[in-house]
Amino acid sequence: MEIDILSLFPDYFTSPLQATILGRAIKQGALSIRSRDIREFGLGKWKQVDDAPYSGEGMLLMAEPVVQAIRSVKREKSKVVYLSPQGQLLSAKKSRELSLCPHLILLCGHYEGIDERALASEVDEEISIGDYVLTNGCAAALVLVDALARFIPGVLGNQESAECDSLENGLLEGPHYTRPRVFEGVQVPEILFCGDHQRIANWRKKVSLERTRERRPDLYLQYFYGDRAFWGAQEDPLKMRETSPQAFSVVLEVKDLRKAKKFYSRMFGKEHWDGDKLLLGEKTSLYLQQTNERRGATKVFVELETEDGFVRFLRRWEMLGGQLGEVGMGNLPLRQVFDLDGHIWVVSCVQK
């Protein structure tokens, strides 16, 4: 893979690209990284690259030097990425995607930014490394290079480690331990010595979920309700049992129609609304009516096909902001839950 970095401070990259894993990868030929100075394409005797904006404070990089710098290294299959706080947030998924590009051109921002005409003409994508502002885009470019390099064959000594790291499956990693077995009275969990690889994997997954929920609730929500068709690749939408042979509709009065639609879309994994109607099953529909004066709470009965579906229903309901109420008496899995408008859903599952 080839990467060209365009900035006003090409020497900024010298040490990081000579040391550590990146330096070794470059020496071995797995990576080729060049740093170019945009000032080489500056205008006039003094190689001017910046000027005052027509409206606003500070200075801007001028369009002509930036465009010329990009075009000097651009090829047919090049992808130009501008490091900007306005861009898409960098993720493990995006890093993996970029690692497949044969040639990347990374454009570093400076001053107050870059003339919009240069961006519109040459940039394919804008990427941000976080919701904060740096003195320039060089540090962001290094972060991006380091993140994507891990997915290039030959960069890491053990490529499997890249597949198992935090965020690769959308979750944080669990804890790691090495010798000694006991340190200052704290022991390594016994399960790691059991020899049962499946039990250990299940334990790691459980701890990973718990850690993500505690430390990064945003990632936890995205794992279950994010961009993997909402449910994740391994899960299907919740299946409700429809006992009535007739078409059945539930009508709920809500204060905030938009908020309620979002809640139920995520809850049932269904994005397509027919106006204010959402089809929950083959014969069951949910209608929402916005009103400022609700006449009272509606009680809805839902029976799920499996106990696993019952548990997932409650977990998702709570994570999306709904409230869990009383647990039913007896052996039947039964629970009352309340939606964002106080309507009561009585949830149970089929007994087999």
Swiss-Prot record:
Task: Note the superkingdom of the native organism.
Answer: Bacteria
Q: List the Gene3D superfamilies hit by this protein, alphabetically.
A: 3.40.1280.10, tRNA(m1g37)methyltransferase, domain 2
E.C. code: 2.1.1.228
Q: Which GO BP terms, alphabetically?
A: tRNA N1-guanine methylation
Keywords, sorted A to Z? Cytoplasm, Methyltransferase, S-adenosyl-L-methionine, Transferase, tRNA processing
InterPro entries recorded: Alpha/beta_knot_MTases, Glyas_Bleomycin-R_OHBP_Dase, tRNA_m1G_MeTrfase_C_sf, tRNA_m1G_MeTrfase_TrmD, tRNA_m1G_MTases_N, tRNA_MeTrfase_TRMD/TRM10
- Subcellular location per the Swiss-Prot or TrEMBL entry: Cytoplasm
**Catalytically driven reaction(s):** guanosine(37) in tRNA + S-adenosyl-L-methionine = N(1)-methylguanosine(37) in tRNA + S-adenosyl-L-homocysteine + H(+)
A GO CC term attached to the entry: cytosol
Family affiliation? Belongs to the RNA methyltransferase TrmD family.
Q: How does it assemble?
A: Homodimer.
Q: What is this protein called?
A: tRNA (guanine-N(1)-)-methyltransferase
Supply the source organism for this entry: Chlamydia muridarum (strain MoPn / Nigg)
Q: What is the lineage of its organism?
A: Bacteria, Pseudomonadati, Chlamydiota, Chlamydiia, Chlamydiales
What gene codes for this chain? trmD
